[in-house]
């Protein structure tokens, strides 16, 4: 079945027909053909995508991506721990909110939504507060589309002996990285982002020695990261509670298609071409990005809304959807914006078609 429209969002996103077709079969969660032949293969493939080094493992966790973030924060940080969070968007703020809900002490570094965090501020906090045990940062902050400089921040955190948690929700699979080289202890992502699967579970790729320290630390039964991992390790891919079987099988297919495309490097190149084509086309129509070009990720881009008195996002959105494209409203607190994603089963030709559709949808310019 063909899609009625293209999702130009940061996830859920447009998937291939073959990924959707992979969900047409039912699976028994007790069978080896599911646990060993699908779940365990996924776990192995994820680690290989994340690093060339040994010592890392992976665990899949039911629910939205935020559930995996909460599982990590709630399991990795002990009763005496303290978290430093870099917050320059809604998703950094969400990590801090999770810590607050879980009664985990938290130091927040907030440079603002349109600025990259300042390394010296983080280093000062780490040097002055020995109670901090963990540092968390979002790689691609999809509030704006900003790509945060994780190398410098992870390096600073490791220099101070801290455990590093990376929210790579909207970057893993679409931006090359080696988490061992970066010094990342826990990396979190989701099925419905750059791997191009469908919603239903997230996953954590972790240094095994750090994950083993999480035993008996979880603040939630269903979000116990260690227990979920241990169950999968001992039972060859078995989940503790109901597994999202159809989503998992679709993700397995999506991983195969990532390999067929040429791996993360090739997908990154496609996403970059999409994003550059998008920005050039939007500028030709008079739209300006919220961020300077050097801050952009290849994942999603925020554009200032037109200042014309007749412009309304909902009307603009509806006209685009009628032409087969779905975009995202803005999420920046101090600027009127909208967002356009370019990940998923989206190619440069699709972006060129989008630019034509946007030109037709600019009703406020009609005389």
From Swiss-Prot:
GO MF annotations, alphabetized: 2-aminoethylphosphonate-pyruvate transaminase activity
Required cofactors, per record?
pyridoxal 5'-phosphate
Identify residues that carry N6-(pyridoxal phosphate)lysine.
Answer: 193
Reply yes or no: does the keyword Transcription regulation apply: no
Q: Which UniProt keywords apply?
A: Aminotransferase, Pyridoxal phosphate, Pyruvate, Transferase
* A Pfam family hit: Aminotran_5
Q: Which GO terms describe its biological process?
A: organic phosphonate catabolic process
Name the InterPro entries on file.
Aminotrans_V_dom, NH2EtPonate_pyrv_transaminase, PyrdxlP-dep_Trfase, PyrdxlP-dep_Trfase_major, PyrdxlP-dep_Trfase_small, SP_NH2Trfase/AEP_transaminase
Q: Does the keyword Transferase apply?
A: yes
- Entry EC number(s): 2.6.1.37
Q: Which domain of life is it from?
A: Bacteria
EC class: transferase
Q: Which SUPFAM superfamilies match?
A: PLP-dependent transferases
Q: Which residues cross the membrane?
A: none
Recorded catalytic activity of this chain's protein: (2-aminoethyl)phosphonate + pyruvate = phosphonoacetaldehyde + L-alanine
Function summary: Involved in phosphonate degradation.
Q: How does it assemble?
A: Homodimer.
Q: Which family does it belong to?
A: Belongs to the class-V pyridoxal-phosphate-dependent aminotransferase family. PhnW subfamily.
Q: What is this protein called?
A: 2-aminoethylphosphonate--pyruvate transaminase
Q: Which organism is it from?
A: Vibrio parahaemolyticus serotype O3:K6 (strain RIMD 2210633)
